């Protein structure tokens, strides 16, 4: 899949063209062999994957015009002229493999960053640091760098900062802050679909699960780790861009032991893509579990559930049933084992797959139009499919007569009197599809609720390790409401990152009286407003049309075009503008097709159908809609899918904002899912969208470590314990004394009104000093500990001496008597 012209244009707009090359000495002559990057070259014109080439500036060049010869990739050797605004300084004589921190480069302009990442990627070094971020590039192959041995290496080494960057680095630092400062942490893993987010999350979970001691109760940890294959089976699917794409968002809260190992946890799932249950695009699959179940079920299951071949179910795309390199049968065995490890009984597991089979079977039921009740298109179930319908209801533990009535019979109330009519075929199809989607979604959420009931701490979470694994920006040929929600989520996450790393930095420095250069950053506030602002945004106009009599997809787009015409983040599409519109997202323009927007946004299962499900004789089915308020009649404002989505997203962001965040940015190097293939325009767009370039600016300007005086003293009291424990001195002065006594250069730190600010290198030095002090005291502590134990033992013995003497006297008396 080649890079598109639109992507090339988007990437080109990101490049900042300024004339600041340092090729000339004081006399105006060119430094011998001076190298630069340029975006002017026949090579670039012929290969869209390349954006910059390396050249040597030739003698005779002027500041107004540079004469260059291309050397990387090798050119023709013919000199040519370029404008200095198309030239960037180059990092000469730098070995990208000798260090993993982009911030240590002399020049961090765009071509230098791309070149640094490329060299490391081509040598299988996929992790790089851009403080406060870890950049992870998908290798599309197993590098063998996430084994248990690697986990022990990063977990047990005295100074992990000397090791190459890794997701384990992020995990260790987050754990250190969780236990060292006693403050909740969140690791946010983000990136485009197919960038490797799910894999990164799994490896971090494995790191947290590793324990230095074997004294832990592994029951809860086993259940948490077992949930991964189950959640992937029910929540992931093959898309055109990713063979294992997460089609839901997941936030986990974990309690991790000081010795390692997961003690408690909780999972929140949101935004499951329900439309995939009913239909999939070409070359895409529905959720993995359908294929795993149909291929991996044993003969008893197949007979009990009446299973057919994968291509015989209308809910599954018959043209895409296989995934290269994926063994659905083997994966099904793992899912069954994982469900057992989640403490689900054999009967529970049977109910789960009975419901899955029922959903697939209901999808095969055909509805027809019939002349009835004054309607020419009244809905009816095809006679030969009644057996299929009854079987589907039986598998889902639902009363077939009641379900049939809810799908076919329309009940209206006029003047307190119920009037029965018939749904037309289209309406009945919507109800049938809604039932399939609701049963699947609620089953998925029930599995998660069951898991949480086994793994959550009784008293709730005081401090926790948060893990956010969420789909990245999506741009398909046809982008619908699901993609809009996904992309809104990513814009919110982007804003969250900007708020945390840039706006908060500037405000914090100002509030604390710390002087530093002004931080400049890219804000996506305008995009958020055009998408979500109350009363005047895409989602608000969508809700208006859903609630208005006679609302249509076309009227929704027209309303947006009329009311948002002054906003440059929204533009009508050039083709089919009555249903298509374009949003200028952080990653570039994305066109949406509003076909079925209203239908999808109103996709709330009717209250009468919910009541039928809750009356099921099966306790698990009864619990599927547990806690859900049944609403009848007209749809209320705020109950639509879009409103529910925004409320859940707001709650998630509030929870994340209450923690200390860590960021892993996953990069997809190409669209072909091939190892060692590098597409610069695509990568640059991601570097920009994920704020990696801005993070490098922050690195040069700010203080990456900051703690309140109390937190600083808690963390670094052993640097000089006398200074830390001096009760006659205020906490602020205690911090100053510790810093001065440590010998740390004043350029490494600032003292604010309530906080200590340290540059990253300063924090490393303090940690090293404290570690050395603790090593010095280790022998002394051992001696004192032994003395205390001896004293306690002596006290215990002395306490028992009178009793022992009485026993001794009694024994002697007996012996004399004999």
Curated annotation (Swiss-Prot):
It is found in: Cell membrane. PROSITE patterns: MYOSIN_MOTOR (PS51456). ATP binds at residues 191-198. It is a peripheral membrane protein. GO terms for cellular component: actin cytoskeleton; cytoplasm; glideosome; inner membrane pellicle complex; membrane; myosin complex; pellicle; plasma membrane. The keyword Metal-binding does not apply. InterPro entries: Kinesin_motor_dom_sf, Myosin_head_motor_dom-like, MYSc_Myo14, P-loop_NTPase. This is Myosin-A.
């Amino acid at each position: 899949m080649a890079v598109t012209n639109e992507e090339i244009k988007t990437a080109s707009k990101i490049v900042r063209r300024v004339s600041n090359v340092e090729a000339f000495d004081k006399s105006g002559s060119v430094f011998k062999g001076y190298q630069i990057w340029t975006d002017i070259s026949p090579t670039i014109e012929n290969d869209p994957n390349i954006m910059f080439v390396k050249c040597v500036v030739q003698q005779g060049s002027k500041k107004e015009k540079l004469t260059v010869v291309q050397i990387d990739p090798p050119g023709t050797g013919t000199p040519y002229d370029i404008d200095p605004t198309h030239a960037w300084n180059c990092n000469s004589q730098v070995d990208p493999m000798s260090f993993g921190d982009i911030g240590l480069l002399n020049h961090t302009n765009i071509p230098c960053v791309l070149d640094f990442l490329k060299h490391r990627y081509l040598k299988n070094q996929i992790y790089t640091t851009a403080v406060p971020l870890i950049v992870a590039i998908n290798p599309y192959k197993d590098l063998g760098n996430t084994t248990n041995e690697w986990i022990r290496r990063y977990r047990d080494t005295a100074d992990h900062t000397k090791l190459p960057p890794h997701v384990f680095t992020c995990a260790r630092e987050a754990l250190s802050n969780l236990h060292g400062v006693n403050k909740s942490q969140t690791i946010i893993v983000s990136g485009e679909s197919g960038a490797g987010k799910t894999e990164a999350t799994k490896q971090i979970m494995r790191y947290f699960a590793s324990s230095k001691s074997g004294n832990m109760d592994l029951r809860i940890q086993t259940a948490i780790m077992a949930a991964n294959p189950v959640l992937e089976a029910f929540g992931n699917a093959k898309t055109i861009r990713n063979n294992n794409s997460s089609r839901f968002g997941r936030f986990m809260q974990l309690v991790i032991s000081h010795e390692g190992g997961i003690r408690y946890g909780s999972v929140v799932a949101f935004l499951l893509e329900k439309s995939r249950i009913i239909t999939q695009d070409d070359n895409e699959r529905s959720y993995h579990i359908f294929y795993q179940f149909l291929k991996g079920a044993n003969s008893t299951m197949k007979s009990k559930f009446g299973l057919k071949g994968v291509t015989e179910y209308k809910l599954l795309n018959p043209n895409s049933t296989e995934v290269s390199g994926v063994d659905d049968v083997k994966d099904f065995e793992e899912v069954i084992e994982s469900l057992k490890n989640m403490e689900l009984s054999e009967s529970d597991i049977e109910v789960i797959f009975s419901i899955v089979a029922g959903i697939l079977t209901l999808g095969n039921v055909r509805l027809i139009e019939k002349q009835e009740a004054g309607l020419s298109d009244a809905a009816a179930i095809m006679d030969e499919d009644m057996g299929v319908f009854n079987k589907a209801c039986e598998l889902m533990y639902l009363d077939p007569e009641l379900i049939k009535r809810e799908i076919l019979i329309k009940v209206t109330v006029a003047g307190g009197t119920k009037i029965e009519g018939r749904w037309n075929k289209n309406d009945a199809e919507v109800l049938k599809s809604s039932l399939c989607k609701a049963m699947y979604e609620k089953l998925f959420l029930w599995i998660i609720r069951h898991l949480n009931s086994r793994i959550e701490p009784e008293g709730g979470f005081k401090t926790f390790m948060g893990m956010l694994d969420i789909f990245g920006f999506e741009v398909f040929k046809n982008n619908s409401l699901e993609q809009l929600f996904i992309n809104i989520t990513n814009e919110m996450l982007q804003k969250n990152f900007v708020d945390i790393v840039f706006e908060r930095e500037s405000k914090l420095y100002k509030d604390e009286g710390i002087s530093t250069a002004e931080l400049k950053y890219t804000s996506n506030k305008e995009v958020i407003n055009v998408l979500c602002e109350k009363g005047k945004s895409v989602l608000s106009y969508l809700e208006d049309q859903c609630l208005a009599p006679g609302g249509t997809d076309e009227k929704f787009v027209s309303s947006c075009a009329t009311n948002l015409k002054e906003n440059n983040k929204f533009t009508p599409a050039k083709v089919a503008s009555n249903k298509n519109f374009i949003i200028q997202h952080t990653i570039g323009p994305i066109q949406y097709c509003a076909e079925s927007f209203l239908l999808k946004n109103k996709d709330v299962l009717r209250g009468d159908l919910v009541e039928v499900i809750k009356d099921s004789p099966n306790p698990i089915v009864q619990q599927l809609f547990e806690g859900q308020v049944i609403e009848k009649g007209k749809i209320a404002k705020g109950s639509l899918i879009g409103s529910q989505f925004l409320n859940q997203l707001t709650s998630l962001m509030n929870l994340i904002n209450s923690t200390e965040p860590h960021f892993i940015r996953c990069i997809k190097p190409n669209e072909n899912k091939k190892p060692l293939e590098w597409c610069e325009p695509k990568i640059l767009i991601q570097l920009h969208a994920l704020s990696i370039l801005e993070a490098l600016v922050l690195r040069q300007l700010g203080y990456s470590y900051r703690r309140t005086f109390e937190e600083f003293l808690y963390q670094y009291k052993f640097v000089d314990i006398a200074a830390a424990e001096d009760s006659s001195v205020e906490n602020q002065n205690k911090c100053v004394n510790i810093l001065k006594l440590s010998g740390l250069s004043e350029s490494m730190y600032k003292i604010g009104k309530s906080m200590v600010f340290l540059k990253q290198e300063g924090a490393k030095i303090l940690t090293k000093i404290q570690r050395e002090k603790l090593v010095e005291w280790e022998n002394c502590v051992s001696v004192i500990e032994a003395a205390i134990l001896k004293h306690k033992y002596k006290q215990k013995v002395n306490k028992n001496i009178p009793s022992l003497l009485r026993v001794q006297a009694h024994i002697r008396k007996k012996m004399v008597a004999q």
